């Protein structure tokens, strides 16, 4: 059986790691051992933060809604309760966007929620 030299394969593997490590600082971009570790860790952070991003954005939407309903004399939790009682089904992302881009539409929703609480 013929001897197989691994130079081409190893070079291709290293090239792949270096490409992924592009933009890293110091030895992490140009020594294979450090670059591999850095790329692996970057992948772990990316995986974790894709999950975390969903939580972060939901928290942001809730903060925006809370700030937008305060002028109407309500807190976020009271507003959400009013929405469910009035039968309005709008998610937090849309509510947050409405509060920023279309204050008049958001005000109408807030008033309906407040009316549902009073009834």
Swiss-Prot record:
InterPro entries according to UniProt: Ribosomal_bL20, RIBOSOMAL_L20_CS, Ribosomal_protein_bL20_C
Signal peptide location: none
Family annotation (SUPFAM superfamilies): Ribosomal protein L20 (SSF74731)
Family matches, as CDD domains: Ribosomal_L20
Pfam families the UniProt entry points to: Ribosomal_L20
Lineage top rank: taxon: Bacteria
An annotated GO BP: translation
MF annotations from Gene Ontology: rRNA binding; structural constituent of ribosome
GO CC annotation: ribonucleoprotein complex; ribosome
Entry keyword set: Ribonucleoprotein, Ribosomal protein, RNA-binding, rRNA-binding
HAMAP family: Ribosomal_bL20 (MF_00382)
General function of this protein: Binds directly to 23S ribosomal RNA and is necessary for the in vitro assembly process of the 50S ribosomal subunit. It is not involved in the protein synthesizing functions of that subunit.
Family the UniProt entry places it in: Belongs to the bacterial ribosomal protein bL20 family.
NCBIfam families, per the entry: rplT_bact
Protein name as annotated: Large ribosomal subunit protein bL20
Species this chain originates from: Rhodopseudomonas palustris (strain HaA2)
Top-level taxonomy: Bacteria, Pseudomonadati, Pseudomonadota, Alphaproteobacteria, Hyphomicrobiales
């Amino acid at each position: 059986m013929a001897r197989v030299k691994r130079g081409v394969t190893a070079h291709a593997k290293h090239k792949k790691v270096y490409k992924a490590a592009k933009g890293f600082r110091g030895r992490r971009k140009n020594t294979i051992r450090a670059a591999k570790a850095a790329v692996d860790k970057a992948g772990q952070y990316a995986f974790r933060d894709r999950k975390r991003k969903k939580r972060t954005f939901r928290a942001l939407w809730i903060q925006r809604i809370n700030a937008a309903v305060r002028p109407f004399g309500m807190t976020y939790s009271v507003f959400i309760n009013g929405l469910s009682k009035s039968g309005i089904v709008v998610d937090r992302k849309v509510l947050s966007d409405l509060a920023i881009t279309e204050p008049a539409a958001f005000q109408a929703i807030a008033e309906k929620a407040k009316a549902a609480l009073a009834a």
